[in-house]
Amino acid sequence: MKNVLIIGGGQMGKIIAKDLSNDYYVQVADRNPNVADIVFDVAQANKVEIKELFDKFDLIIGALPSKLGFKPLLHAVENGSDYVDLSFMENDPSGLFDVARKNKSIVFHDCGLSPGLSNLIAGKLNATYNPTYITIMVGGISQDPNTPYGHINTWCVEDLQEEYTRPARFILNGKERLVSPLNSRFWSKHRFDNIDELEGFMSDGLRSLLKLKGPDVLSEITLRHKGHLTSVRKLIGNNTFVKMIKEKCPTKKDMVVMRIECDDATITMIDKQQ
């Protein structure tokens, strides 16, 4: 049985551990002993300590907040370890490709819902239809639109805030552009069967798709319940976003709403937590 190490025992890490535990020997490393099999603070660890830990496992999975994600990925590549990363890091991991090839390290980065699954679908649409445009629309939202801010906490709130503050990259006329996610000129409205009207904002989730050859227009739009963006812009403005989302947004049933479209095809997925 293969040995798998998950770095980070938070909301993502604990679900991954549960999903993999039937088929692999899984251990979780975290600085919090209440969630960790191995108490390990990757932010404070040095290169030797990280190598010593990574050498015990066949695969490393990074499930850390974005500000911590790059360091273990870098050490995995330098060490020749195989690594899958889910963190929404601001760094561009593609700069490590040459080192990874040299050290025979297999790395999959941005392996979440979006970026991640959405990128795979967009890549398949591009290969199949050779489209002029691809638009990714995706959101994790509350099943109940009356939940405060229409949101359910399912991942790191500090990283969630980055979706609204990090400039969003998109492709227009074949060239990379930037826009502020909270610029209301670029907000949009969207409808799905049996779901109240949603609103969308441009977010920085294209990642590897920014280098995709073919489409002249590429964008990712994050979906939220109606009224969410106006409220969030106020929270960001008065620096209370993290506090209010943690306090007000309950742990209830969420759902994923995704639509990826191009000139000749549309893929729609609605997945509700049971």
What name fits each language-model region?
Residues 4-8:
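Conserved N-terminal Rossmann-fold NAD(P)-binding element of oxidoreductases
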Residues 12:
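Hydrophobic/small residue at the entry helix of a nucleotide-binding pocket
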Residues 24-39:
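NAD(P)-binding Rossmann-fold cofactor-contacting core
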Residues 43-56:
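Conserved Rossmann-fold cofactor-binding substructure of NAD(P)-dependent oxidoreductases
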Residues 59-76, 89-92:
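Beta-loop-alpha module in the N-terminal Rossmann-like domain of NAD(P)-dependent dehydrogenases
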Residues 79-82, 103-105:
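A short helix->loop->beta-strand "cap" motif at the edges of active sites that frequently abuts
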Residues 87-109:
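Rossmann-fold NAD(P)-binding glycine/threonine-rich loop
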Residues 127-274:
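C-terminal catalytic/substrate-binding lobe primarily of soluble NAD(P)-dependent oxidoreductases
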